[in-house]
């Protein structure tokens, strides 16, 4: 057993998990449960009353956090300590949304001035493009942006841009390309005019296979459509650490934006990786996004653990994963603009906490990162919600909804809200056999048929959920929401004693992919790998089954 599972608190939680009453009983016995188990900060309201928890549960979970030195680990992250131990890096995405007055030390120097300089450079660039001052190679203004990246440099900008669609104000169109499948970029290029298109290439090394391949394809298209090598600088900019490679490509050094080792890809949308966002919503709104995230950072760093929203959410996720064998967690967004958030949180959580050894290399004997999935309400109610209500797996849920709609049409939002709240109630209370029989009492079915149908209509309830509300979806509230989930992810990793900031599984996939690519291009059939890999490579080389 590991130190964590040997602890008295862990053992107490395991015993306590078997003694929790049904949530129906918990609500019946405590009329103040909603007010006692809700929290408001940074423009967000969290109702965590529909969890399998009593005051004793929270006390035990908070004790577990204290024993894991969560407070000290939070301070270490904000202080710029080397908490990504396998890569010997600080973890300072929080510095990207810091204020100019702060001092944050990384690698022996204050990094805040460079962050502020980059924001100012972004401001100048966004103004140049959106004002029409930036011209393409034929003198036309830019109308379309193509953002080329992968992972965090793709998903963050895309999902945030989608979420903030009501704040698009610059008249630009933005297209996102990530997958190395040629169909992805080909379909985008069919829509574009090379004279009015600007490409943003985002890659720390300027060598990420998918991103570089797509960028080279974009460049070849641009040159084939009338552009010249000397025109590349007017249509390509880069966010990268490798200035030399970017300038060799033809990008003007003045149009290269920095990336830093102390920011992981899945935490990078707050940096110049967020250029596509800023080009769509303007820098004032982009700064509001940063402001909301900074407010959540301040809350996370300073609020007592018992009143700390990311801590509460992280502890409950751990509670279900480690003591109720919950293998997945569903995120349900009751707002069309937020429909992409489950995929974003999926990458954030699963790439961060999909680990199986502790910081000192000991194999864990407890579950770590769950599968994160989800979708848009109310669509999911007519699909996978069935499994949430009557399936055999316990799947904790997060419901996210703004109280006010950007598009208040008739009763649409009232119906949306009623469905959201109704689902949380149904998951919590379920339906008993007696209740199901009562519903069938006036039917013409025989008693035997009624009993049979009633058994099929029984729902156990006691299915946990959090509900997150905001007044309205704005850049500021979105920033706070995303930062909330970043810190929630950190809380779990800190207690599990794993490194939430490396991704060696991703790196292995890249390495083996490059090796296979070389074998695909070889003259002879593949023979050196396992039989399956050899067979697949050779079938691909034949081009038919």
UniProtKB/Swiss-Prot annotation:
| Reaction(s) the record says it catalyses | alpha-D-glucose 6-phosphate = beta-D-fructose 6-phosphate
Q: What is its EC number?
A: 5.3.1.9
Q: Which organism is it from?
A: Shewanella sp. (strain ANA-3)
Q: Which domain of life is it from?
A: Bacteria
What GO biological process terms does the UniProt entry carry, in alphabetical order? gluconeogenesis; glucose 6-phosphate metabolic process; glycolytic process
Q: What is this protein called?
A: Glucose-6-phosphate isomerase
What family does this chain come from, according to its entry?
A: Belongs to the GPI family.
Q: What class of enzyme is it?
A: isomerase
The free-text function statement in the UniProt record for this protein reads: Catalyzes the reversible isomerization of glucose-6-phosphate to fructose-6-phosphate.
Q: Where in the cell is it found?
A: Cytoplasm
